[in-house]
Design a protein with these regions (language model features):
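A short, Lys/Arg-rich alpha-helix, primarily the initiator
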Residues: 1-13
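Short, conserved catalytic or interaction motifs in soluble domains
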Residues: 37
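Short alpha-helical DNA-recognition segment
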Residues: 15-34
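Short, charged recognition helix plus adjacent turn
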Residues: 62-75
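Alpha-helical residues within the helix-turn-helix
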Residues: 12, 23, 52
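DNA major-groove recognition helix of helix-turn-helix/homeodomain DNA-binding modules
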Residues: 26, 45-60
Length: 75
């Protein structure tokens, strides 16, 4: 699996375009396309935004786990 293939799969499964997702993240479509292509590293802010949009944990996006569910918040 490519570096950021999961973000493309999640976007497609959610029926979102790169343009729509860019607007949600307040970045350009071009910047977002670089993330999906793996030609630019995703900033922590965008990574957190993606996790919030898709309701998955950041580790899933980074291929550190196959568990999609968000981790419980620690108080």
């Amino acid at each position: 699996m490519k570096k950021y293939e999961r973000i493309r799969n999640l976007r497609e499964d959610s029926d979102l375009t790169q343009m729509e997702l860019g607007k949600l993240l307040r970045i350009s479509q071009r910047a977002y396309s670089h993330y999906e292509a793996g030609t630019r590293d995703i900033s922590i802010g965008v990574l957190i935004g993606l996790a919030d949009i898709y309701k998955v944990n950041v580790y899933y996006l980074l291929h550190r786990t196959d568990v999609k569910e968000m981790l419980p918040k620690v108080i």
